[in-house]
A protein has these predicted regions:
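C-terminal motif of bacterial Sec signal peptides marking the signal peptidase cleavage site
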Residues: 17-18
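N-terminal active-site segment of His-dependent metallophosphoesterases
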Residues: 22-91
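A short C-terminal boundary segment appended to hydrolase-like catalytic domains
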Residues: 34, 296-412, 416-420, 465, ...
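Active-site neighborhood of phospho(di)ester-bond hydrolases with catalytic His/Asp-centered motifs
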Residues: 42-44, 75-81, 110-117, 203-207, ...
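Active-site-proximal segments of metal-dependent phosphoesterases and phosphodiesterases across multiple
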Residues: 55, 164, 168-179, 193-246, ...
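Extended active-site neighborhood of metal-dependent phosphoesterases/phosphodiesterases
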Residues: 87-191, 195-197, 231, 254, ...
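Recognizes extended acidic, P/S/T-rich segments that occur
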Residues: 403-444
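Beta-strand-rich modules
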Residues: 443-459
Length: 478
């Protein structure tokens, strides 16, 4: 890591409490002589100290190696939850990994960090963060928030402070995570970015996603307990050129709802900007209530993901999604592109969640066409006196098949007697199985049943069913 070539960008915040250094300065690598287009990587939720699956000491070096192998990066951003519980020993593991140049395919001069909720789970959390990350800031305390310009693009990082909760049901949690001093600082830096870089997007990085934006931030749309805060919405809503990268949810990048742009500049939701979910480099989860296996279905600890953001020759911004567990791009034929000018006029990533707040009648993405099974697909059944085990092929979709709805109907009564919602395992990408098998119980011996399997995408578009009739076997003789 080159610690010689630096410019100083002053980042001061006047937040009360503890003995933390709230006037720390970020040392910014001098890239003024580099004329190559901007390119940077983003990951989040690395959770050093966690032993989920292979653990951070295996998963994060692999992610660094893979993401840096695709070309030279101007910055590498880690969007909070750096640690499992904010301990100094956990930060020491992080420094060990990120300072080891053998973990990088190409050198990276600029690492950007910020605090997430897990980084506050310690009485010395702020001090541990600032002191431990000194190797990435010229030996000086690492700042909580930072502002810098890299190749003409403004970068703003915003730490969140001591809370374990979102502010959906407890607004005080939001004011604790993002206190007034942080809000005022962000207002100043957003205004500065707009003045210094008037035709550029403003890249903002913070752990907790703004409400009513990407996946997991809409309690109105079946996500159960939301994973968001509305604290920053009023500031960001003033800047349609804001591009916010947020983690926390651990939701997979393969879900098309991982990117969102607003449709109404006057919305009470205050969401007229871009938000991109950054997933996790520890493990992935699903929204509550989607599949029967819960938020951590099979393979959840074998999923780590990240992003590479590239400046295109025409000034647009391209976002590539990567599976850093398997070293492969996620949906390379469907890369996200943020189009210039960045004033909201080119927003294309709004969807049906905005249907009740679309006075300008903008196009809302609905995920169609519905998923489909290949011609000739069929069900394979194993039947007992009380259950049926069904094996079926994976369906196709223009985005991803999220889950399968299975229903067993009593033919005589015309009543559904057993049902299931089965995860497709799409987040395993090339390791996604070609077929799935599931058992449904509660059948009566000797009765005739029909079984249907339908594929569903993230927008609940449903395929035509695969169907089969069968009869439960008779009970064994005593």
């Amino acid at each position: 890591m080159d610690m010689v070539r630096y410019l100083i960008s002053v980042v001061s915040v006047a937040v009360l409490g503890g003995c933390a250094d709230y006037d720390a300065e970020l040392m910014v690598a001098d890239q003024s002589q580099d004329t190559a287009p901007l390119s940077f990587a983003v990951i989040s939720d690395v959770h050093f100290g966690s032993t989920t699956g292979e653990g951070a000491m295996v998963k994060v070096p692999r992610a660094l190696k893979y993401l840096s192998s695709y070309g030279e990066l101007d910055a590498f951003v880690v969007v909070g939850d750096l640690t499992e519980s904010g301990k100094r020993s956990e930060y020491e593991l992080l420094v060990q990994v990120f300072a080891d140049e053998s973990n990088l395919s190409y050198p990276i001069d600029q690492f950007l960090f910020m605090m997430g909720n897990h980084d506050n789970y310690n009485g010395n959390a702020k001090s541990n963060y600032q002191k431990s990350l000194r190797p990435f800031n010229g030996g000086e305390n690492y700042p909580f928030h930072s502002y810098c310009v890299i190749k003409g693009y403004p970068f703003i990082t915003v730490s969140m402070f001591g809370t374990e909760s979102n502010d959906i049901d407890d607004p005080s949690a939001g004011s604790e995570a993002y206190p007034e001093e942080t809000i005022e600082w962000l207002e100043q830096k957003m205004a500065l970015a707009a003045r210094e870089c008037p035709d550029k997007p403003i890249f903002v990085f913070t752990h907790m996603p703004p409400r009513w934006t990407s996946i997991g931030t809409w309690t109105e749309h079946g996500n159960g307990e939301a994973w968001c805060m509305s604290s920053l919405n009023p500031v960001l809503d003033e800047y349609p050129q804001a591009v916010v990268f947020a983690g926390h949810t651990h939701y997979t990048l393969g879900d098309p709802r991982s990117i969102h742009q607003g449709v109404n500049p006057d919305s009470k939701r205050q969401n007229y900007f871009t938000v991109i979910n950054t997933s996790s480099t520890s493990y992935c989860e699903l929204p509550y209530g989607v599949v029967d296996d819960g938020v951590k279905p099979m393979g959840y600890d074998c999923v780590t993901e990240g992003l590479i953001v590239n400046e295109l020759p025409n000034g647009d911004i391209e976002i590539r999604r990567y599976d850093t567990y398997r070293n492969e791009e996620i949906y390379p034929d469907n890369r996200w592109v943020l189009k210039a000018p960045f004033d909201g006029s080119q927003f294309t990533y709004a969807d049906l969640r905005d249907a009740d707040d679309n006075p300008l009648g903008k196009h809302l993405y609905d995920g169609k066409p519905s998923p489909w099974f290949s011609e000739g697909s069929s069900l394979a059944l194993e039947v007992s006196s009380s259950s049926v085990t069904v094996t079926f092929p994976q369906a196709d979709d223009n985005d991803c098949v999220s889950r399968y709805s299975i229903a067993v109907t009593d033919v005589e009564l015309n009543e559904v007697v057993a049902s299931a919602s089965v995860f497709s395992l799409f987040y395993l990408n090339s390791d996604m199985p070609e077929t799935l098998t599931h058992t449904l119980s509660g059948l009566a011996p000797g009765k005739e049943y029909s079984i249907e399997v339908r594929a569903c995408d993230s927008y609940e578009n449903v395929s035509a069913p695969l169907r089969s009739l069968f009869r439960a076997t008779s009970s064994a003789l005593p």
